[in-house]
UniProtKB/Swiss-Prot annotation:
Region named Disordered: 78-107
The keyword Repeat is assigned to this record: yes
Gene3D superfamilies: Ankyrin repeat-containing domain
SMART domains assigned: ANK
Full protein name: Ankyrin repeat domain-containing protein 23
Protein's UniProt keywords contain Coiled coil: yes
Lineage of the organism: Eukaryota, Metazoa, Chordata, Craniata, Vertebrata
Complexes and interactors: Interacts with titin/TTN and MYPN.
Keywords recorded for this protein, A-Z: ANK repeat, Coiled coil, Nucleus, Repeat
InterPro entries per UniProt: Ankyrin-SOCS_Box, Ankyrin_rpt, Ankyrin_rpt-contain_sf
Record-level Gene Ontology MF annotations: titin binding
Cross-referenced Pfam families: Ank, Ank_2
Gene Ontology BP terms: fatty acid metabolic process; regulation of sarcomere organization; response to muscle stretch
ANK repeats: 144-173, 177-206, 210-239, 243-272
Length: 306
């Protein structure tokens, strides 16, 4: 019969080696007596040994997995190992799904004039290509003499403009008001298309039926970038329409301060009179007087009283 001292019970030095190490039913000399039940202290000691053993095994695994970089070969091995690891975890590229956006299909039916002009306004190049491939006239127009090039310039479809010009669209084609595509580009405020047309040889000082120039149109619409480019390309800054108005008259009338400053900067004349014998300065005074009269007329009105 084995005897266990009080110190051994307290310190837990003698543990059940049969349970911890052998595990095969072989009696361990000096172990716990048969039929002996483990107490709380012995159970704690047993758990400590388990934790220490697990930590030791983890440390061994970590040390065995480390690479020493003593020479160039070790570095190459490390690089190859990392590369293989990335390849294992690399996500393969997704194949295009069958539900992806369908490509625009070329219509089988012939494209009529109305559909052709509408396609130019809506930038539907497939319809344009079909119309031109079937021998359609790129200069075809509606009852107001508006062509596909007019619409493309107004809406800002630069690629379509290039395609129509390459197909033979006339750059000086005029609508019912004698306005060329340059007018329409200025109306839409599309500087890139305006540059394309002028570089192609379009007239910068063309006049419509009321003698307005592209400069007048750019000022009326407030597109100062188009205005400045027209001036730099040789636009007549003091050109007058049928009413005798210059671009400066229009800038004052519409209250476009930036356009007014640009015109004055480039040398627009202040003393040019229109048909009503008004200079831009007088027009500004009348405009201010009209605003003042409108305000004074509503002083004390119940609807405008604070």
């Amino acid at each position: 019969m084995d005897f266990i001292s009080i110190e051994q019970l307290v310190s837990g030095e003698r543990v059940d080696r049969k349970a911890l190490e052998f595990g095969r039913g072989v009696p361990d000399p000096g172990g716990w007596p048969s039929g002996w039940t483990l107490g709380p202290q012995e159970a704690v000691a047993r758990e400590k040994l388990k934790l220490e053993e697990e930590k030791r095994k983890k440390l061994e695994r970590f040390n065995s997995s480390r690479l020493t970089l003593d020479n160039l070969t070790d570095l190459e091995n490390l690089v190859q190992r990392r590369r293989k690891k990335r390849q294992r975890h690399k996500v393969p590229p997704r194949e295009p799904e069958s539900g992806a956006e369908p490509q625009p299909q070329v219509p089988l039916e012939p494209v009529g004039l109305e559909m052709f002009l509408k396609a130019a306004a809506e930038n539907q190049e497939a319809l344009i290509d079909k119309y031109l491939a079937d021998g359609g006239d790129p200069n075809a127009h509606d009852k107001l003499h508006r062509t596909a090039l007019h619409w493309a310039c107004l809406k800002g479809h630069r690629q379509l403009v290039n395609k129509l010009l390459a197909a033979g669209a006339a750059i000086e084609v005029r609508d019912l008001l004698d306005r060329t595509p340059v007018f329409w580009a200025c109306r839409g405020g599309h500087l890139d298309i305006l540059k394309r047309l002028l570089n192609q040889g379009a007239q910068v000082n063309a006049q419509d039926k009321i003698w307005s120039t592209p400069l007048h149109v750019a000022v009326r619409m407030g597109h100062s970038d188009c205005l400045e480019h027209l001036i730099e390309c040789g636009a007549h800054i003091n050109a007058q329409d049928k009413e005798g108005d210059t671009a400066l008259h229009e800038a004052v009338r519409y209250g476009h301060h930036k356009a007014t400053k640009l015109l004055l900067l480039y040398g627009a004349k202040l003393g040019v009179k229109n048909v009503a014998s008004q200079t831009p300065v007088q027009l500004a005074r009348d405009w201010q007087r009209g605003i003042r009269d409108a305000l004074q007329a509503h002083v004390g009105h119940p609807r405008t009283r604070c």
